[in-house]
Amino acid sequence: MSNSGHPKDRGNRRGLMLVLSSPSGAGKTTLSRMLLEEFGDVKLSISATTRPPRPNEVHGEDYYFKTPDEFHRMIERREFLEWAHVFDKHYGTPKADTVARLEAGEDVLFDVDWQGADALHDQMPNDVVSVFILPPSIEALQARLMGRPGSTPELVARRMEDAKREIMHWRRYDYVIVNDDLNVAYQRLKRILLVERLKRLRQIDLEDHVRALLGEA
């Protein structure tokens, strides 16, 4: 059931950027989906990309589809919080869209690797809350990857090497969750979100409230 939060609370706080990273197979996508289903005021970040749309993908909902020239102009105008070149295509996070959502009191969820998390933090350090999801063991991670459709020993071996490289950067994150029980991991992620929403720097009306209490309004 969606929980959009108290309308007054949303209006009186600045949203946050919840950045999730993990090695492939650690459960990040499932945890993200659970959070989006429960909290109506948490929105998934929409990336811009130069790859062509797949069937049923909608511009402005799944991605912002751009030509290479359009994408490069956005880079030149510094319109991205972060961008990357992946398999001959470009992907990037438009800054204006994220800022508008934060100012509206919405939280924006990011699914990025450690380099993307670093770039987002460099651009907007006061807004980023970063969480790294770890598997309970290397054996469990390998079993999850082997269980995916289309997996081959070669593909799993490559993903395991990628996973170890990603795990090496766990200390860069504000929070770390070991996903050995999905429901427990989700409750921890949810508590992180709720506590971070209450931080002083996100309560945008507090300064006026304190001035009124002190008779300075």
UniProtKB/Swiss-Prot annotation:
Any one GO molecular function term: ATP binding
Catalytic activity: GMP + ATP = GDP + ADP
Enzyme nomenclature, EC number: 2.7.4.8
CDD domains attached to this UniProt entry: GMPK (cd00071)
SMART domains recorded: GuKc
Record-annotated Guanylate kinase-like domain positions: 15-194
Main localization category: cytoplasm
Protein purpose: Essential for recycling GMP and indirectly, cGMP.
Family: Belongs to the guanylate kinase family.
Name of the protein this chain belongs to: Guanylate kinase
Naturally occurring in which organism (per UniProt): Hyphomonas neptunium (strain ATCC 15444)
Gene: gmk
